[in-house]
Amino acid sequence: MPQLNSGGGDELGANDELIRFKDEGEQEEKSPGEGSAEGDLADVKSSLVNESENHSSDSDSEVERRPPPREAFEKHRDYLTEALRRQQDAAFFKGPPYAGYPFLMIPDLGGHYLPNGALSPSARTYLQMKWPLLDSPSTAGLKDARSPSPAHLSNKVPVVQHPHHMHPLTPLITYSNEHFSPGTPPGHLSPEIDPKTGIPRPPHPSELSPYYPLSPGAVGQIPHPLGWLVPPQGQPMYSIPPGGFRHPYPALAMNASMSSLVSSRFSPHMVPPPHHSLHTSGIPHPAIVSPIVKQEPSSGNISPNLHTKSNMIVKKEEEKKPHIKKPLNAFMLYMKEMRAKVVAECTLKESAAINQILGRRWHSLSREEQAKYYELARKERQLHSQLYPSWSARDNYGKRKKRKREKQSPEMETHTKTKKMCVQHLPADKSCDSPASSHGSMLDSPATPSAALASPAAPAATHSEQAQPLSLTTKPEARAQLSLSHSAAFLASKSPSSSSFSGHLSSPVGSPLLSRPIPLTSSILSPSGVFPSALQALPLLQAQPLSLVTKSSD
């Protein structure tokens, strides 16, 4: 975009202006009948250029501009109104493709330039241009370079201009009290390109500030360069509500200061409804995207609710079904008939006693008398089957059993839990009762046959006794533990101290060992202190003697 130096002469500005007007004139010659409109536009542009040159200040940091004198107001207003009327009548300028975003124009923040050097379409069309008089590339350089206009007239709406060389990660407007530093294009971006001709243009001079520093309190207080077109501060022509700001771009994050500023500065009754139209890129820059968390109901939260609902529906359906009583049998028919007589004869009021009396009388009846009631019961069943063909006794009894299960299930669960806890937490020495009081904890057989046979004092078995089978008579409740005793004896014989244990047992006990059984207790099977505990228990235990019954070889 051609720029003017602060000290540039009128001749240089005139030459540039004439060249650009010539280009625009060639482009506008394609549509006939626009000569008068072209002349009016040229007059307005030249007057604007003269104003900007006359009112430019010498300071580089000046960002405000005073409105033009009162004498030129009427003249410029007439020019612009006439130009606007002719543009609308001739339909020379088309409406913007994105009509719903009047406050901030969002360009494609990344990738302004195509590989061939031309400007991308998204960068060309990022501004709304209902009336592109002030936004055309030919006149952009003719504005005051020291105090560039922050806003263009887009359908008479003040729009903050986004500079071409803003960094992609820079937010659209920085709300701070500090001024922007003089901007230079970053290294990864090529110089600015004229969107009409494709010719690279010199960037903004380093001594010029292409931005307006906007603070939360300063928006709406900066004097507009075209003050004769903008209404006063208290009466904005077009207002922008927060909803209109956010609606076309829901991913834009607007902080609290911005929302309060917009809602307080502008009234929401004059803004046209925004259209649902996205930018050409369709994807906002990640630097200005606010994270949106979608809350989706999980399946785990839904399934229990559905399960309970289905159960409730089934229960309601069951309750809606009428309760059908089963047909009465012969005894019930007799009770129904004779109950009133028994109640009248007896002074008893308890139903159990009355039922007992009726039962005795029923059994005292003869077969012929009972046959009458059996016949009545058969007819009752036939009538019931005709009235309720699909009924079965399981319908009633199933409900009762179901109710009982529901009532008993928590009790049974607690009962089984307490049982398991008792078994788990019993100590090892108290897991079995004492042998004197417990019948099932004791065997009438020696603990280890090897211990009895290995003792020198024990009588040697003869050949006939060895050949004959040995029958051990045990108590009935102890037979189940016989195999366990043999396995325990085998383990005891395999232990390294079995020989010493057998000798120790045989010396004090001697031959009476066969007449005294050794009980199989948990203390004997315990790994620690196996044999001393058994020796301590031997004198205390008195049980029935072991009877050895031998069979003859015949």
Swiss-Prot record:
Subcellular location field: Cytoplasm; Nucleus
Range of residues in the leader sequence: none
The record describes the protein's role as: Participates in the Wnt signaling pathway. Binds to DNA and acts as a repressor in the absence of ctnnb1-A and possibly ctnnb1-B, and as an activator in the presence of these proteins. Required early in development for the establishment of the dorsal body axis in response to maternal Wnt signaling. Also required during development of the CNS for the establishment of dorsal-ventral patterning in the prospective diencephalon.
Q: Where is the composition biased (Gly residues)?
A: 1-11
- Determine the domain of life of the protein's source: Eukaryota
- Keyword Mitochondrion attributed: no
* Record-given protein name: Transcription factor 7-like 1-A
Q: Which GO terms describe its biological process?
A: canonical Wnt signaling pathway; negative regulation of transcription by RNA polymerase II; regulation of transcription by RNA polymerase II
PANTHER family recorded for this chain?
TRANSCRIPTION FACTOR 7 FAMILY MEMBER, TRANSCRIPTION FACTOR 7-LIKE 1
Identify the coding gene.
tcf7l1-a
